[in-house]
Each structure stands twice: as structure tokens, then as C-alpha cells.
Amino acid sequence: MTYHFSGMDELLHEAFTRFSGTIVAVFEERLGAAGSPDEAREAVADLVHHLSGGNQRELILTHELYTLAARRPAYRELTRTWMSRSRRALEWHFDPATARQLDALIEGLSIHRALETEPHERALTVEAIARITAPHA
């Protein structure tokens, strides 16, 4: 460890940096494949259900990173960068305010689905996305 990293904290920070990069890559892959607004909305629903699809490792790592970010500025910066990159991918299809709302929706619904004993159905996710992305008069 000491050959590549100055200590455990540097190793941990690098591991969380790589982890957050893998999640952003999923966002970029799903949203990059969308060619229309409807496909982009479906991609957002796919993200919610993919991220909450039973991979406890990702859920645990995400929450451990959030805990560190709440306590330590270096990890807060890492999560800020992660959110910024996720929103940029959403902005390929949605305006910045909508992208920010969708990013929070993805996060919240993913956490709720992962922790519920009976996760909500895709229809609820699709309806929430439609409400956020509906044209406003």
C-alpha cells in the first residue's frame, strides 16, 4: 500500500473516486444511448431500477461515501464532482434545473427501492419522471 499511496486515507479516497466513476459511466452509457426525449425518460427510469437492483455492495459503498462526505471536506468534494458529472449527463437531454431534479429523484428513488422490503414498481418511477419533465405552461 505505501508504495502507491501515502496512507489508508489516500487509498480509500482513490477507491471511492473510482467507484463514483463507475456510477457516472452507467449514467453516461444509458443517457448516451437515448435519441429522443421519451428514450431519455426511459433511460432515467432504467437508472433508478438498475441502481436499486439488488447490488448491496453499491448501496453500502454509496452510503459509506455519503457518511464520509458529511464529515470530511475531501469526500464532500468527491461527491460534489460525482453529482456534477451525473447532472451533466442528464443535461444532454434536459435543461439544468430539470437535470438537478432528476438527479435527486434517481438518488432518492434508488435508495428507497433498495431499502424497501417491497420496492415500488417501475410505473411509479415513470410517473415521477413524467411529472418532473412535463412541459410547464
Task: Report each predicted region and the residues it spans.
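Hydrophobic alpha-helical connector segments
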Residues: 25-59, 102
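Hydrophobic/aromatic-rich alpha-helical bundle segments in the mid-to-C-terminal region
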Residues: 75-80, 93-137
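Amphipathic alpha-helical packing segments from all-alpha helical-bundle domains
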Residues: 24, 53-63, 68-100, 126-127
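Short amphipathic alpha-helical interaction patches enriched in hydrophobic/aromatic residues
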Residues: 27, 31, 69-73, 109-114
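Short alpha-helical scaffolding segments that buttress acidic/His motifs in well-ordered protein cores
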Residues: 47-48, 62-66, 102, 106-109
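Append "Primarily bacterial transcriptional regulators
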Residues: 1
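An amphipathic alpha-helix adjacent to DNA-recognition modules
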Residues: 4-28
